[in-house]
């Protein structure tokens, strides 16, 4: 039933093929238009100036020698990091003001607006930890989230998964003193620290001053396979 000469293409087939060619050409043209913009975005995500920024922060810490709470030291470090980074995604479980995890450079992620870098998780420590695992698995994002050390128990299943999956997820646990604070014994972490230290492939740091806090952030950011 083939009544055509060798290498002759019937018009019906040729016309359909041309339609596909036009569709492909349109896709290629669209890609060429957005390529330059995408290239800049992707390069910014892959590139970070963490080492340079943290080196400057260490010099400042030596010069100033201020006595600061480590959560305040962490905020100062984060403020420097978020001024240049496009892939640090911060957040807190309704304790941003206490954890000092939100900086002046952050923009809040809202429904319908995901072009930002800070999440208000609410009183949802377990959900926060699970979401951070998802962010780390999805792309080149480096998620970090804050809560009180006592509430690390709510995060424990996801923290363990971070370690098992070798994901760079950073947990900022403040208010780690065993001293009885204004919130009473329900907020008094006793066994939490030893429990976290028993998890394989989980780095647990407890800095004493601003310099150690900067070093902790540097190590956490460099540890690509360890939460």
Where are these regions (language model features)?
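Conserved thiamine diphosphate
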Residues: 120-227
């Amino acid at each position: 039933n083939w009544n055509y000469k060798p290498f002759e293409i019937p018009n019906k087939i040729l016309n359909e093929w041309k339609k596909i060619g036009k569709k492909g050409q349109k896709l290629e043209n669209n890609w060429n238009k957005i390529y330059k913009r995408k290239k800049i975005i992707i390069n910014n995500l892959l590139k970070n100036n963490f080492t340079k920024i943290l080196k400057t922060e260490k010099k400042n810490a030596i010069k100033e020698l201020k006595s600061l709470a480590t959560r305040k030291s962490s905020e100062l470090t984060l403020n420097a990091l978020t001024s240049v980074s496009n892939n640090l995604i911060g957040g807190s479980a309704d304790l941003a003001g206490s954890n000092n995890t939100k900086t002046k450079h952050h923009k809040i992620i809202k429904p319908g607006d995901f072009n930002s870098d800070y999440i208000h998780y609410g009183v949802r420590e377990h959900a926060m930890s699970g979401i951070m695992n998802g962010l780390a698995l999805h792309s080149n994002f480096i998620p970090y989230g804050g809560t009180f050390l006592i509430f690390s128990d709510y995060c424990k299943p996801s923290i363990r998964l971070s370690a098992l999956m070798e994901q760079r997820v950073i947990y900022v646990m403040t208010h780690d003193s065993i001293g009885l604070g204004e919130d009473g014994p329900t907020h008094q972490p006793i066994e939490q620290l030893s429990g976290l230290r028993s998890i394989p492939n989980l780095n647990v740091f407890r800095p004493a001053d601003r310099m150690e806090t900067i070093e902790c952030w540097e190590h956490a950011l460099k540890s690509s396979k360890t939460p």
